[in-house]
Amino acid sequence: MTARTDPGALRHDWTREELQALFDLPFNDLLFEAQLVHRRWFKADEVQMSTLLSIKTGGCPEDCGYCAQSSKFDTGLKASKLMEVEKVLAEARKAKEAGATRYCMGAAWREPKDRDMDMVCAMVEGIKDMGMETCMTLGMLSGQQVHRLAQSGLDYYNHNIDTSEEYYPKVISTRTYQDRLETLERVRNAGINVCSGGIVGMGESPSDRIGMLMTLANLEEHPQSVPINMLMPVEGTALGASEKIDPIDFVRLIAVARIAMPQSVVRLSAGREHMSEETQALCFLAGANSIFIGEKLLTTKNPEADKDQRLFAKLGIRSMPAHSCPSEKDVSADRKAG
């Protein structure tokens, strides 16, 4: 049975042909189907507001072609040390006051050092005590590090697959696609919710975008959170001169992600700064139900808060409460056990 005969049914056996057929539907039909799926599992007028903070910026030894924080590229970005716990918690309080219900923290590492885990876990615990969802993106993790994060009560771990397996070697050479999948499996097996998506506009083909969604939708469990990023080219990086993806194609991708992963929160991540209000509205209609608020996403620009507030008011959108994802796993037991 396909999603088209049972809107919102969970599947893990999507074929490339099925996903391509969805993408190729007449635009109105595709959005209608995505809305049917979306309304089965979520409130259609709710969008989660998240905030992303770079807790350790620059100096990363990886060569991800899109990233301003790679030490392989001259982007003018100065490397910094891991932020102090209290400073991170202070920023989290500001984010909550601004309306965020989810707090994400990113560190420019290949993988964290064991000596950093005490501070990282203290950040998680402090932010959870504020009542917000917590998410970390720290690169690859050892089994012991995953266990530490689970004990701290981390709700989500982000590790994007970035693109299709076929196109991946053209973007990154210092970490394999399989490395990423193994990290996701390690996180999932520890009981932490998975946040994983990708980036479009890196020169990949439409088929590569479908391949990326197929990989995510056919995982043992769908990622509870699926961020879709529109590349914001950074001068000095390998992909600094990339052309933008067509907005309608981007909306189509959001709709296919919603249909293929019906219980996942689909997040409009990087790139909103260059999206019109109309494009964002179509993305919400297609099933996107999370955004990042705040003036910066790690090192790139993001729409100012008042612009988002005006757009939400125009569209009649309300803030989604924390822990509204229907497939989210409760991590509180892990924290108590720790």
UniProtKB/Swiss-Prot annotation:
Annotated positions binding [2Fe-2S] cluster: 104, 135, 195, 267
Superkingdom of source: Bacteria
In the record, what terms sit under GO molecular function? 2 iron, 2 sulfur cluster binding; 4 iron, 4 sulfur cluster binding; biotin synthase activity; iron ion binding
Per UniProt, the enzyme's principal EC class comes to: transferase
Tell me the cofactor note: Binds 1 [4Fe-4S] cluster. The cluster is coordinated with 3 cysteines and an exchangeable S-adenosyl-L-methionine.
Annotated positions binding [4Fe-4S] cluster: 60, 64, 67
Q: Which GO terms describe its biological process?
A: biotin biosynthetic process
Query: What does the record give as its pathway?
Result: Cofactor biosynthesis; biotin biosynthesis; biotin from 7,8-diaminononanoate: step 2/2
CDD domains for this protein: Radical_SAM (cd01335)
| Cofactor(s) in the UniProt record | [4Fe-4S] cluster; [2Fe-2S] cluster
Keywords from UniProt, A to Z, are: 2Fe-2S, 4Fe-4S, Biotin biosynthesis, Iron, Iron-sulfur, Metal-binding, S-adenosyl-L-methionine, Transferase
User: Residue ranges of the Radical SAM core domain?
Assistant: 45-272
* Cysteine disulfide partners in this protein: none
> In which family does this protein belong, per the annotation?
Belongs to the radical SAM superfamily. Biotin synthase family.
Q: What does this protein do?
A: Catalyzes the conversion of dethiobiotin (DTB) to biotin by the insertion of a sulfur atom into dethiobiotin via a radical-based mechanism.
Q: Indicate what this protein is called per its UniProt record.
A: Biotin synthase
Species in which this protein is naturally found: Parvibaculum lavamentivorans (strain DS-1 / DSM 13023 / NCIMB 13966)
Query: What is the taxonomic lineage of the source species?
Result: Bacteria, Pseudomonadati, Pseudomonadota, Alphaproteobacteria, Hyphomicrobiales
> Gene of origin?
bioB
